[in-house]
């Protein structure tokens, strides 16, 4: 087969390289998009440490950002640009996921119960501000008892604990 038969007429060397790379890049793009969904993708027995994974994502993100910022490459294929855009979107998802994990961890910490020693007493871990609720209740009850035991209190005063039900505030409540 002659050399001229394998050469497309009217294409420069750069255009020929881009044209032959386009199907390969399309295949890479397809594999990158479907890698997590495929059951047959080999998984490394040694997973990356979180620091290594974060460093890898940062390097990929920087490489794609620099590639997309350079507009002087007209021979770069559309598929490669799309691949970089997808990688940049994926690199932002782990940060969002870690924020969700922190929120879940916070909520779990304040909703879980723990057993103390060998006793059967179960105490719940509460938010520090919620620990003030019993003190506020004690203050209210002391104020109510002081108001109720004063000599000027009439019979109708004990019917409402803190304020009338129609929403009007009494002068002694303020």
UniProtKB/Swiss-Prot annotation:
SMART domains assigned: NMU
Keyword Signal assigned: yes
Family matches, as Pfam families: NMU
Modified residues (Methionine sulfoxide): 141
Keyword Signal: yes
InterPro entries: Neuromedin-U_amidation-site (IPR018070), NMU (IPR042384), NMU_C (IPR008200)
Subcellular locations according to the entry: Secreted
Domain of life: Eukaryota
Biological process, per Gene Ontology: eating behavior; energy homeostasis; gastric acid secretion; negative regulation of eating behavior; negative regulation of gastric acid secretion; negative regulation of gastric emptying; neuropeptide signaling pathway; photoperiodism
GO molecular function: neuromedin U receptor binding; type 1 neuromedin U receptor binding; type 2 neuromedin U receptor binding
Keyword vocabulary terms for this entry: Amidation, Cleavage on pair of basic residues, Neuropeptide, Oxidation, Secreted, Signal
Leader peptide range in chain numbering: 1-37
Propeptide: 38-105, 170-174
Location of Asparagine amide modifications: 166
Main location (coarse class): secreted
GO cellular component: extracellular region; terminal bouton
PANTHER family, per the entry: NEUROMEDIN-U
Role noted for this protein: Stimulates muscle contractions of specific regions of the gastrointestinal tract.
Family affiliation: Belongs to the NmU family.
UniProt name for this protein: Neuromedin-U
The organism of origin for this protein: Mus musculus (Mouse)
